[in-house]
From Swiss-Prot:
Pathway: Amino-acid biosynthesis; D-alanine biosynthesis; D-alanine from L-alanine: step 1/1. It comes from the Bacteria. One of its GO terms (biological process) is D-alanine biosynthetic process. The keyword Isomerase applies. CDD domains: PLPDE_III_AR_proteobact. This is Alanine racemase. It comes from Pseudomonas taetrolens. The keyword Membrane does not apply. SMART domains: Ala_racemase_C (SM01005). HAMAP family: Ala_racemase. It holds the Pfam family Ala_racemase_C.
Length: 357
């Protein structure tokens, strides 16, 4: 069997969820949208269900997958609904729903439901993606209450730059949110992963840890609380070929690496079809036979090459960690000019193995 696999440590997942609770004292929705950022939504939900206050996904399709797997905990639809016809399913399956636009509010008002909804009313506090304008927020809240279709409302917004700890934007968003919710008697939710780790002043009865659940930092610089996270995924494979090259020889497509010295080259069963970033350049760190080395040459669809010159003990069959506990996903993402969110979500072909259940 091809050795490219993702090892998912569910005990580390639980540790990171508990850390979100510990740091905030709030209730926490575990964000498991996009198949739990490539970690497997159902398995992650089952691992957390005994202690999680609820889950958050992008859309009703993701929520129904959890319900089909027997997950009974609250599930929030972060994008809300896309058509009014979804409201009956939302009520039937006891899902919670974000309302971020007036058309959604109007759809709720005119739809007959057999049970009232739990709505998370989203404010655009400055990100300008989705969310109600502050001038419409109070009226929307009152209309939801008056509709007779809503049993509970949670007030929410989303940070745009909370991963930048020295930026003024987050404090400004907090101020906009605080002003908009004045006089509204409801719980609130502001803090995502960087909010949990770096913005203790942000009000939140509910927090929404996403990336931090999987043990990756949302920050580009070191941050004390993020250092306590435990990586959940280890992307691993093995060396499948070794060759010796003299100085001056090219490696891989486009000859993007030319050996500056006699070089021992290892080929690893891992490529961009597995989700490893094709744009990862020469020098991207990897771990082989327990020692750090680096990527050389362009990443191929199914294979990549690494420098084994200074790892003489590595040979065919030696284990390789592409990211995990020793080579952080954030390191690989930074070298590739992207973010850990993306490299996790890009994993499609790699089978997953679970430990710590």
């Amino acid at each position: 069997m091809r050795p490219a696999r993702a090892l998912i440590d569910l005990q580390a997942l639980r540790h990171n969820y508990r850390l979100a609770r510990e740091l905030t004292g709030a209730k926490a929705l575990a964000v498991i949208k996009a198949d739990a950022y490539g970690h497997g939504a159902v398995r992650c939900a089952l691992a957390l269900e005994a202690e999680a206050d609820g889950f958050a996904v992008a859309c009703i399709e993701e929520a129904l997958e959890l319900r089909a797997a027997g997950i009974k905990a609250p599930v929030l639809l972060l994008e809300g609904f896309f058509e009014a016809s979804e409201l009956a399913l939302i009520a039937e399956h006891d899902l919670w729903c974000v309302v971020h636009s007036l058309w959604q509010l109007e759809a709720i008002e005119r739809t007959q439901l057999h049970k009232p909804l739990t709505v998370w009313l989203k404010l655009d506090s400055g990100m300008h993606r989705v969310g109600l304008h502050p001038k419409d927020y109070h009226e929307a809240y009152q209309r939801l209450l008056a509709s007779g279709k809503v049993a509970r409302i949670v007030l929410m917004s989303h940070f745009a730059r909370a991963d930048e700890l020295d930026a003024d934007a987050t404090a400004q968003q907090i101020a906009v949110f605080e002003a908009a919710r004045q006089g509204l008697a409801a719980e609130c939710s502001l803090r995502n992963s960087p909010g949990v780790l770096g913005w203790p002043q942000a009000p939140s009865d509910w927090v929404r840890p996403g990336l931090m659940l999987y043990g990756a930092t949302p920050f580009e610089v070191a941050q004390a609380e993020a250092e306590r996270l435990q990586p959940v995924m280890t992307l691993q494979s093995r060396v499948i070929s070794v060759r010796e090259l003299p100085a001056g020889e090219p490696v891989g497509y486009g000859a993007k690496f030319v050996s500056p010295r006699p070089t021992r080259v290892g080929v690893v069963a891992m490529g961009y079809a597995d989700g490893y970033p094709r744009q990862a350049p020469n020098g991207t760190p990897v771990l082989v036979a327990g020692k750090r080395t680096q990527l050389i040459g362009r990443v191929s669809m199914d294979m990549l090459s690494i420098d084994l010159t200074d790892v003489p003990e590595a040979t065919v069959g030696s284990p390789v960690e592409l990211w995990g506990k020793h080579v952080l996903a954030s390191e690989v993402a930074a070298h590739a000019g992207t973010i850990p969110y993306q490299i996790f979500c890009n994993l499609k072909r790699v089978p997953r193995d679970y430990i710590g259940e």
